[in-house]
């Protein structure tokens, strides 16, 4: 899932990972969008999930506002938008991570457009969920996308 609405593009020059005041954050509309997505997921039976997030504040805030359970930070979900040299390594790391997980319950990864596009080929809008299925060959198959 791509984080919900956060006005702007990229991150400011003074970006610091552990300081939300230096980041592009969710707007009020983005917070409401995440809450609506959480309610919609609950209405179709996903009342709890394993939720993993990039360490970026806009992703953590999206994950928290879904209201589906505790959030675990997963650094391979961090954006590589400003460091494209990390694209291949990070994408392989997250693909291997997905393939090693027990996915008996719904699993939601909240991340960034560049990460999702590198992994799936899909260019998601803010708040869009890209559903993938693991294949026997340790790959991922696109099932579809969901955008409220």
Can you name each region flagged by the protein language model?
Residues 105-111:
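Generic beta-sheet signal
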Residues 1-76, 80-84, 92, 104, ...:
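Active-site-proximal alpha-helix that buttresses catalytic centers in soluble enzyme cores
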Residues 88:
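Short, glycine/charge-rich flexible loops or terminal/linker lids adjacent to PRPP-binding catalytic cores
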Residues 91-100:
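A short, acidic, amphipathic alpha-helical segment used as a generic capping/interface helix at domain edges
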């Amino acid at each position: 899932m791509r984080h919900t609405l956060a006005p702007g593009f990229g991150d400011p020059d003074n970006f610091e990972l552990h300081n939300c005041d230096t980041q592009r954050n969710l707007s009020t509309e983005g917070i409401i969008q995440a809450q609506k997505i959480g309610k919609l997921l609950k209405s179709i039976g996903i009342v709890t999930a394993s939720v993993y997030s990039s360490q970026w504040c806009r992703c953590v805030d999206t994950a928290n506002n879904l209201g589906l359970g505790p959030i675990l930070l997963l650094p391979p979900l961090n954006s590589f938008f400003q460091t494209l040299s990390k694209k291949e390594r990070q994408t392989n790391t997250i693909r291997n991570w997905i393939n090693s997980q027990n996915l008996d319950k719904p699993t939601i990864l909240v991340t960034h457009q560049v990460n999702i596009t590198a992994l799936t080929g899909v260019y998601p809008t803010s708040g869009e969920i890209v559903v993938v299925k693991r294949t026997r060959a340790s790959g991922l198959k696109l099932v579809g996308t969901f955008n409220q």
